[in-house]
């Protein structure tokens, strides 16, 4: 056809020399096309009807209870309530035998195939009761497994990928700590640099552009660092911070690691609240998910110290889940009417919770042992407005800050409650003593902050007015009431930051950017009082040797950066960084040495001083030598550049003389120069005198 049109056109206009014959697109005789229909029309063929059409939205539920006809309706209501959470159910069939008794399985048809797939994903292996655990499958899966080929084909061997050593950061012979610095380079693009805090200057390990969209977070033992992205989050680790695992959860805003780094919890928003997913870190598998309402307090998960349990607070109850199955402990929640808050012990499987006052029944703080659910201590409290639970890091003590009132005022409908005559109690539970005795400390002033010494038996309190507060230090000992050991008066601090190793504390005012470093073993002397204007964060390194204060661009846009101090408050580094976001020290895993071995090392520490000091001197000498060599190299480079320019200037002398009227201006004396002063009017002012 194309050839015929070409001949007609040629006859009509034979004189048109620009016209060229159209190419012939006809296939030659015997041509065989090697492109399959799937490659050419894959998108259209995917829509053709298949034999499975009509049953892909059907699920088969096995291991349901076998009941008589009189109990069938109740069974249907229970099962339909579960399965209707994942879509509209069109049809349900419960096969029965001759006596009308169910056979232990059922068929359910959803409106859409995607709903059936979601039901299978969520309800497979769901435990209905102690004797029945669902086995839920798609109806099409039966056909798929029936068509398994009889001849077995061995799977293809995949090459083993050697994973980077995740704990190489603790193998440094000098035990230098690492930290990361994040700075926003563009909207939703954050650059993260990883550094090692070596002497005399930190060493840059790695810098990643566009590493995260918002911020980063270290895992509790420092093994992983997590980054946030639109599709979800990812964890990185190893010597070069390779991607270890990714967790698809769009819009994730916050994550939590379990204390032993076995699980990760992601929190992401939904139209009705937020979705919470618990992941297995090693496999990347989703262990369980929850959809919570908008109340963040009720949706926060708290882990036991050994990762064996995770708990959340519900309405008048605590839900405790066992790992790795994530079923409720004993398949039921713990009913606690009026519960307002709870917290795990950091070293034992003990939960502390408090219950509000109800109908003339006093408020109560309870310690419960898990998994026995045995109450090991109760403490009744009267006239309670609120409570806060503060565990000491070693688990030796629990402090309950009790906000108490002298008078309660309610409106007619009891909708608005006002507490008058507020005062505060600190109930100290001695967890390691017999029958867990409780001591009380009362303070009649406003409480601004409370902090335990992580390793030790002291706690500190900021109380009084905001601009002129007092800082009190108490010491807790066995068999006696907590004693006030020091009070620092007229301080303007708002936060307290103890060193991870105890003894030293930073009293910070994060509104004004002022800091005071205090040594609690030397009569609480203030060793230094530096300022860092607009500083909004304070970070101790894991060893308690360094402190960093930072000004984040999340708070201000000018003069962002961080300062590094020694534990005594001496400034050692100032860094101004545009759009600085956050500074985080890399955590360390707990030591493998026993307490006896640690005490022995501390006792004989003087033996190591000479070796340490010699090593420090060599390091500083090496650093000084490197600095001198660097300066010498820079000087040589400059002199080489200078000599080249002088030689070039000398070569151009004849041309300069020619351009300047055959006058050698290079050797002119200053006496031969005429100086002429030119004056001109710049401004004129008129002043009237009386």
Curated annotation (Swiss-Prot):
Basic and acidic residues bias spans = 1-11
Major localization class: cytoplasm
Q: Where is this region: Disordered?
A: 1-36
Question: What InterPro entries does this protein's entry cite?
Answer: EIF3B, eIF3B_RRM, Nucleotide-bd_a/b_plait_sf, RBD_domain_sf, RRM_dom, TIF_beta_prop-like, WD40/YVTN_repeat-like_dom_sf
Give a yes or no for keyword S-adenosyl-L-methionine in this entry.
no
Q: Write out the coiled-coil annotation as residue ranges.
A: 595-645
The residue spans of each WD repeat are 207-246, 293-331, 334-369, 442-484, 530-575
Write down the HAMAP family for this protein, in alphabetical order: eIF3b
Q: Protein name, please? A: Eukaryotic translation initiation factor 3 subunit B
Origin species, per record, is Drosophila simulans
- What gene name is given for the protein in this entry? eIF3b
């Amino acid at each position: 056809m194309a050839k015929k049109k070409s001949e007609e056109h040629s006859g009509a206009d034979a004189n048109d020399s620009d016209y060229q014959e159209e190419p012939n697109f006809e296939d030659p005789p015997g041509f065989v096309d090697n492109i399959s229909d799937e490659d050419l029309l894959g998108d259209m063929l995917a829509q053709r009807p298949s034999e499975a059409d009509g049953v892909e939205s059907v699920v088969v539920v096995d291991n349901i209870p076998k009941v008589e006809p009189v109990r069938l309706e109740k069974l249907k209501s229970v099962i339909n309530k579960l399965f209707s959470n994942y879509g509209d159910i069109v049809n349900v069939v419960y096969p029965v035998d001759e006596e009308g008794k169910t056979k232990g399985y059922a068929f359910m048809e959803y409106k859409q195939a995607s709903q059936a797939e979601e039901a299978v994903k969520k309800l497979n292996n769901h435990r209905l009761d102690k004797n029945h655990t669902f086995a839920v499958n798609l109806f099409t899966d039966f056909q798929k497994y029936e068509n398994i080929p009889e001849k077995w084909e061995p799977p293809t061997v995949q090459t083993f990928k050697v994973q980077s050593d995740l704990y190489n950061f603790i193998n440094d012979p000098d035990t230098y700590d690492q930290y990361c610095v994040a700075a926003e380079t563009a909207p939703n693009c954050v650059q993260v640099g990883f550094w090692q805090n070596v002497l005399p200057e930190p060493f840059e390990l790695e810098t990643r552009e566009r590493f995260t969209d918002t911020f980063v977070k270290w895992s509790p033992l420092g093994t992983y660092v997590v980054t946030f992205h639109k599709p979800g989050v990812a964890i990185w680790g190893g010597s070069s911070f390779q991607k270890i695992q990714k967790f698809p959860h769009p819009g994730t805003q916050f994550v939590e690691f379990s204390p032993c780094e076995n699980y990760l919890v992601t929190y992401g928003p939904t139209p009705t609240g937020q979705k919470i997913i618990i992941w297995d870190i090693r496999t990347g598998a989703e262990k369980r998910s929850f959809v919570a309402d908008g109340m963040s307090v009720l949706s926060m998960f708290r882990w036991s110290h050994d990762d064996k349990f995770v708990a959340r607070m519900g309405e008048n109850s605590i839900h405790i889940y066992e790992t790795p199955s994530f079923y409720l402990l004993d398949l039921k929640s713990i009913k606690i009417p009026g519960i307002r808050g709870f917290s795990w012990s950091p070293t034992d499987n003990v939960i502390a919770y408090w219950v509000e006052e109800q109908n003339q029944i006093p408020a109560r703080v309870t310690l419960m042992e898990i998994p026995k659910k045995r109450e090991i201590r109760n403490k009744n409290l009267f006239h309670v407005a609120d409570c806060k639970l503060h565990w000491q890091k070693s688990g030796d003590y629990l402090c309950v800050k009790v906000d108490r009132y002298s008078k309660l005022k309610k409106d007619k409908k009891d909708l608005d409650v006002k507490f008058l005559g507020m005062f505060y109690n600190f109930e100290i539970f001695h967890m390691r003593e017999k029958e867990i005795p409780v001591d009380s400390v009362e303070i009649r002033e406003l409480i601004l902050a409370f902090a335990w010494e992580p390793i030790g038996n002291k706690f500190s309190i900021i109380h009084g007015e905001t601009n002129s507060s007092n800082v009190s230090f108490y010491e807790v000992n066995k068999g006696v009431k907590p004693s006030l050991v020091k009070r620092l008066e007229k301080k303007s601090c708002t936060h307290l930051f103890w060193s991870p190793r105890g003894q030293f504390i930073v009293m910070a005012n994060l509104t004004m950017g002022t800091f005071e470093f205090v040594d609690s073993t030397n009569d609480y002397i203030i060793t230094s009082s530096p300022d860092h204007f607009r500083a909004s964060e304070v970070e101790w390194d894991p060893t308690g040797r360094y402190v960093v204060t930072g000004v984040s661009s999340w708070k201000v846009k000018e003069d962002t950066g961080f300062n590094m101090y020694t534990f005594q408050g001496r400034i050692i580094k100032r860094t101004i960084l545009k759009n600085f976001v956050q500074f985080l020290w890399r955590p360390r895993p707990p030591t493998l040495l026993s307490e006896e071995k640690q005490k022995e090392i501390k006792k004989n520490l003087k033996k190591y001083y000479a070796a340490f000091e010699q090593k420090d001197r060599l390091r500083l000498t090496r650093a000084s030598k490197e600095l001198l060599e660097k300066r010498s190299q820079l000087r040589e480079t400059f002199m080489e550049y200078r000599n080249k320019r002088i030689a070039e200037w000398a070569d151009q002398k004849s041309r300069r003389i020619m351009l300047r009227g055959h006058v050698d201006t290079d050797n002119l004396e200053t006496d031969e120069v005429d100086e002429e002063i030119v004056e001109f009017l710049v401004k004129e002012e008129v002043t009237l005198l009386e």
